[in-house]
Amino acid sequence: MKKLVLFLGVLMILMFTGCGGKKEAADTGEKKLKVGMVLSTGGLGDKSFNDSAYAGLVRAKEDYNIEFNYVEPASISEFGQFLDDYAAAGYDLVVAIGFNMESPLKEVAPNYPDTKFAVVDAVVDEPNVTSILFNSKEGSFMVGAVAGMMTKTDTIGYIGGIDMSFLNEFRDGYVAGAEYVNPNIEVRSLYVGGSNPFNDPAKAKELSLALKNNDADIIYGVAGGSGLGLLEAVSENEDLYAIGVDSDQDGAVEGKVLTSMMKRVDNSLYTITGELVEGKLENGVRMFGIKEGGISTSEFKFTKDLIGEEKLAKIKAIEEKIISGEVVVK
C-alpha cells in the first residue's frame, strides 16, 4: 500500500505597504510549482540517501514555497506506476531516487514531454530528464584513507547491497584510499543480495559479524537501509567500527561511526528545485564531486579525539590534493 504524504505549503498573504519587501508566489497569484518524489526501497528512516533526498526537498519547499509530495514504494515493481501517477497528476518536477529507477523512468518520461524529471544515481537520456550523478569514488577514497589509517588489524570490510558496477565504484574507491595510506591493507567484501538487498538489516548484521570474525575491525556499508544492521553490529561490539554512507550517520552510534561518506543528495535536489523555480532547469547529466560540494566526509563530530589531530590533518591534506588535481581518483 503506497504511503503518500502531502506537504501543503503555507499561504503567505502580504499587505502592500510603503516599506515594500520580499514577494512570495501568493502576491502575484502564481500557481505553486509541484514536486513529487519517488523514494527508493528502504524509504525514510534509512539514515542514508532517502533521508538526504527528503531533507533537500523539505528545505526547497520552505525556501521556494512549492508543494512537495513523496511516496515510499514497497518494491521495485512499483516504481514505474508511481512515476506515472505524479506525471499524470500534473506535477512540474518528478524526482526518482536510486539507480533502479533507470528502466522505469525510460518508459515513463517520453509519455510526458511537458513534465520535467530528475533521477539520482542513474542516466536517462531524454530531453525532459536531469540525471544527477555523484563522484562517489572520490568520497569513498577519502573514507578508505580514514579506515586505512585507523585499522589495528590491517583488515577492513565492505558490505554492498549487490555486486554490480555502480556500487563497486564505492568499493573500488574505498580500496584505493585505504591502499594510498596503508600498503599492507586487506579489504574483504560481502554483499547483502536476496530479494530486498537495500532493506535487509538482519542480513547486513550477519555479514558484519562474519567480517569481524575474519579480522575486519572497520566496515564500510553501502547498502541503503540494510546498513542499519551494520550500525547495530558496531553498537554491540566494542572493537568494531563503521563508516557511514550517503548522509551523516555519525550520530547513529556515537563514537562508533568513524566518519560518513556524504553524498549530498540534499544539496543537489535543492539546487535543481531552485533552477526549476527560476525556469533554468536543463536536461542532461550533472556531476557533483568533492570540488563541486556534492561529496564530502562528515565532520568527525564524535570521533575527533579517537582519530587525533595528526590523522585529521592528513585526511584534510588528501581532500585538498583531490580538489587541486594532485590526486586523481580513477
Mark where each language-model region is.
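Core hydrophobic alpha-helical membrane-spanning segments
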Residues: 7-13
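A residue-level marker of the well-folded mature domains of exported/periplasmic proteins
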Residues: 22-330
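C-terminal motif of bacterial Sec signal peptides marking the signal peptidase cleavage site
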Residues: 15-18
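Positively charged n-region of N-terminal signal peptides that target proteins for export
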Residues: 1-5
